[in-house]
């Protein structure tokens, strides 16, 4: 006759709220702490990226744009829907034109005639705006481009003449898609190209084509 042994489990049953719930709680707490630390690290890192470098103030920009000129005329234009549409047509589909107002500074000769115009623009680079000036000859072509204020630790090479000179002589009807890139400054290059193209398009529509 086979003998069957029945073993009785004498260990007490685990009570709810034992070890595993506590471990799970600590895991969740550690995960949340890690997320918060990462968030604050990213926030601090973003703040540290803001490095403002001023190369030209407004007065210096005007002197550079119009050397020797004794009188500068400021002209502010509120754009009509027709003007904005004409500017948008020049810019094409890749640039969305959102401006409602444009301010130009005109250097005047002794006879009171404009020898050129300057516009100050702002375009977002990687995270912060690049403030720049564009000098435009009476024929609507670019004479000079200068970075006035740069606010990021990378991409500042766009302020060099070796890059900026690519814009010289270009007008509203000229291509801007063949501007050479700078390694490590792609976003800044795009922003400057966009800003200069907008400047010549505005000048063409307002003062050359005289669209109302």
Predicted regions span which residues?
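Intrinsically disordered terminal and processing segments
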Residues: 2-8, 23-32, 36-131, 138-212
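Positively charged N-terminal leader segments that act as targeting/secretion signals
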Residues: 11-23
């Amino acid at each position: 006759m086979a003998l069957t042994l029945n073993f009785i489990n004498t260990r007490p049953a685990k009570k709810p709220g034992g070890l595993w719930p506590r471990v799970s709680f600590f895991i969740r707490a550690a995960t949340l702490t890690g997320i918060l630390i990462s968030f604050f690290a990213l926030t601090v890192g973003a703040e540290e990226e803001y490095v403002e470098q001023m190369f030209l103030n407004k007065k210096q920009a005007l002197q550079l744009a119009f050397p020797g000129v004794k009188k500068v005329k400021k002209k502010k234009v509120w754009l009509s829907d027709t003007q904005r549409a004409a500017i948008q047509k020049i810019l094409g589909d890749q640039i969305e034109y959102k401006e409602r107002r444009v301010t130009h500074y005109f250097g005047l000769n002794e006879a009171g005639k404009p020898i050129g115009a300057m516009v100050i623009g702002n375009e977002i680079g990687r995270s912060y705006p690049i403030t720049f000036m564009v000098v435009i000859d009476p024929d609507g072509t670019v004479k000079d481009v200068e970075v006035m204020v740069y606010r990021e630790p990378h991409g500042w090479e766009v302020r060099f003449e070796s890059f900026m000179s690519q814009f010289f002589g270009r007008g509203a009807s000229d291509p801007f898609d063949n501007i050479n890139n700078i390694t490590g400054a792609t976003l800044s290059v795009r922003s400057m190209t966009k800003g200069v193209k907008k400047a010549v398009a505005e000048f063409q529509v307002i003062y050359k084509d005289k669209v109302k």
